[in-house]
Swiss-Prot record:
Protein name: Interleukin-2 receptor subunit beta
Ranges of residues in domain Fibronectin type-III: 135-235
Subcellular location, record wording: Cell membrane; Cell surface
GO biological process: cytokine-mediated signaling pathway; immunoglobulin mediated immune response; interleukin-15-mediated signaling pathway; interleukin-2-mediated signaling pathway; negative regulation of apoptotic process; positive regulation of phagocytosis
A molecular-function term among this protein's GO annotations: interleukin-2 receptor activity
Gene source species: Rattus norvegicus
Glycosylation sites: 43, 55, 71, 150
Role of this protein: Receptor for interleukin-2. This beta subunit is involved in receptor mediated endocytosis and transduces the mitogenic signals of IL2. Probably in association with IL15RA, involved in the stimulation of neutrophil phagocytosis by IL15.
Residue spans crossing the bilayer: 240-267
Segments carrying motif Box 1 motif: 280-288
Gene3D superfamilies tied to this protein: Immunoglobulins
Keywords: Cell membrane, Disulfide bond, Glycoprotein, Membrane, Receptor, Signal, Transmembrane, Transmembrane helix
Subunit architecture: Non-covalent dimer of an alpha and a beta subunit. IL2R exists in 3 different forms: a high affinity dimer, an intermediate affinity monomer (beta subunit), and a low affinity monomer (alpha subunit). The high and intermediate affinity forms also associate with a gamma subunit. Interacts with SHB upon interleukin stimulation.
Bilayer disposition of the protein: Single-pass type I membrane protein
Length: 537
């Protein structure tokens, strides 16, 4: 029977015990009326405000670390009505590092009652989550002026754990004002000085500073430091305007009104313009003193000196300028060449000298602008020379030239006719026609060729002994010297030596009457066929 009664009472006892333990634990861990702060070094300051009036004579706070073998106790003293405070000194020195960021403290409030000591409250305290540093101290004025002042301070008992997270606030007030009207300055970095500006000269001020560590869950500002009083210097008697912006404003307004006054004077005074012009003109140098020839030539007109010597229409061509005639290049063995030679032989008269004639044209710039591979050459004379099929009689013992044999080489010109330009040496010299044609606009503007009188060649052309050598001779050969000039004959009229003839030996030849060349017309194949219908091709 006793066993049955115990079996149903045991669960009831356990339930009541659990409820009592939960109630006691809630009462112990309730720290809303106990506020403690750690100064990051060796001090924990606590403030206890009991929830109900207690009939006690004294109370203490006991601190125990979960990682260290010491217990610390401080006595609570009343600071105001229903408030008790004390400071737990954890280390032997105020600057000793007694706790770390992983330490936990168990704080208990114990009070003495009539029957003995009773534990009133117990809570767990995280030191680095509840930081409140000591107020800054040692405020001093570093530099002071009439409107500016530099003040510094110091902080102490700050752990190296929180030193990089410090921020400051400073407030300034006039000596006869309250702190509620003070100006607050925030310093978001670890700066232990402040530079005050826009102060009033010869005025007294007070300054206070506080610090906070931006670390942990609960961040609390330190108490304000002791106020430091200072006085600015009196103003200099020369300073008439106390505000800098007012001085700048007056300067700008003065310049503006001065400019308007000058404009009005220049507009209203008519005689001032010529006088000012005369005054400024005296400092301008007269160019006629340095350019006397131009001054006398243009009558002292400077604009005429600088203007163009020709009108603007001079640079715009109004009509098409005459051009040089196109050149006809004929093959010596072609049918057209044979027809031309036959027609010339039929209509020409013998030349007094017995040699062919050549027409010379002065071409200035044609080859420079129209030849793709032309070098930079000066203006020169271009000779257009041909020989209308001269036949020479040779001695009985000598060989006779065939009818289709090439023309003998030309002799160099004499006198002043040899001052033509030397072109780059080439193996393919062209036959140039001296005929003049109508200007062709496809070539662009060019200089009109200047026709010169026909040149007379000396008599006595040596004949070539071998037809093979004649086959190698070009129909038109222009012999040039080493210096680029043509070789000239002697003035006595002697026979000029030809290199080809010197190789074969000189023989006496008789020159047939040479056709008189018409240098003003060069008949084309169509014109020849129109004149002589018996030689149509």
């Amino acid at each position: 029977m006793a066993t049955v009664d115990l079996s149903w009472r045991l669960p009831l006892y356990i339930l009541l015990l659990l409820l009592a333990t939960t109630w006691v634990s809630a009462a112990v861990n309730d720290c809303s009326h106990l506020k403690c702060f750690y100064n990051s070094r060796a001090n924990v300051s606590c403030m206890w405000s009991p929830e109900e009036a207690l009939n006690v004579t004294s109370c203490h706070i006991h601190a125990k670390s979960d990682m260290r073998h010491w217990n610390k106790t401080c006595e609570l003293t009343p600071v105001r009505q229903a408030s008790w405070a004390c400071n737990l000194i954890l280390g032997p020195l105020p600057d000793s590092q007694s706790l770390t960021s992983v330490d936990l403290l168990s704080l208990s409030v114990v009070c003495w009652e009539e029957k003995g000591w009773r534990r009133v409250k117990t809570c767990t305290f995280h030191p680095f989550d509840n930081l409140r540093l000591i107020a800054p101290h040692s405020l001093q004025v570093l530099h002071i002026e009439t409107r500016r002042c530099n003040i510094s301070w110091e902080v102490s008992q700050v752990s190296h754990y929180v030193n990089p997270y410090l921020e400051f606030e400073a407030r300034r007030r006039l000596l006869d004002r309250s702190w509620e009207d003070a100006s607050v300055f925030s310093l978001k970095q670890r700066q232990q000085w402040i530079f005050l500006e826009t102060l009033t000269p010869d005025t007294s001020y007070e300054l206070q500073v506080r610090v906070i560590a931006q670390r942990g869950k609960t961040r609390t500002w330190s108490p304000w430091s002791q106020p430091m009083a200072f006085r600015t210097r009196p103003a200099d008697p020369k300073e008439i305007f106390p505000l800098p912006w007012l001085r700048c404003l007056l300067l700008v307004l003065g310049c503006f009104f001065g400019f308007l006054s000058c404009v009005c004077v220049l507009v209203k005074c008519r005689y001032l313009g010529p006088w000012l012009k005369t005054l400024l003109k005296c400092h301008i140098p007269d160019p006629s003193e340095f350019f006397s020839q131009l001054s006398s030539q243009h009558g002292g007109d400077l604009q005429k000196w600088l203007s163009s010597p020709v009108p603007q229409s001079f640079f715009s061509p109004t009509g098409s300028a005459p051009e040089i005639s196109p050149l006809e290049v004929l093959d010596r063995d072609s049918k057209t060449m044979q027809m031309l030679l036959f027609q010339k032989e039929k209509a020409s008269s013998p030349s007094p000298s017995g040699h062919s004639q050549a027409s010379c044209f002065t071409n200035q710039g044609y080859f420079f602008f129209h030849l793709s591979n032309a070098l930079e050459i000066e203006s020169c004379q271009v000779y257009f020379t041909y020989d209308p099929c001269m036949e020479e009689d040779v001695e009985e013992d000598g060989p006779r030239l065939p009818e289709e044999s090439p023309l003998p080489p030309l002799l160099p010109f004499t006198g002043e006719q040899d001052d033509y330009c030397a072109f780059p040496p080439r193996d393919d010299l062209l036959l140039f026609s001296p005929s003049m044609s109508t200007p062709n606009t496809a070539y662009g503007n060019s200089i009109t060729p200047e026709e010169r009188p026909p040149l007379s060649l000396q008599e006595g052309l040596p004949s070539l002994a071998s037809p093979d050598l004649m086959g190698l001779q070009h129909p038109l050969e222009l012999e040039l010297g080493d210096d680029g000039e043509g070789m000239s004959t002697n003035s006595s009229g002697q026979q000029a030596s030809v290199p080809e003839a010197a190789l074969m030996g000189t023989t006496k030849t008789e020159a047939r009457p040479v056709l008189t060349l018409n240098t003003d017309a060069y008949l084309s194949l169509q014109e020849l066929q129109a004149q002589d219908s018996a030689h149509l091709i």
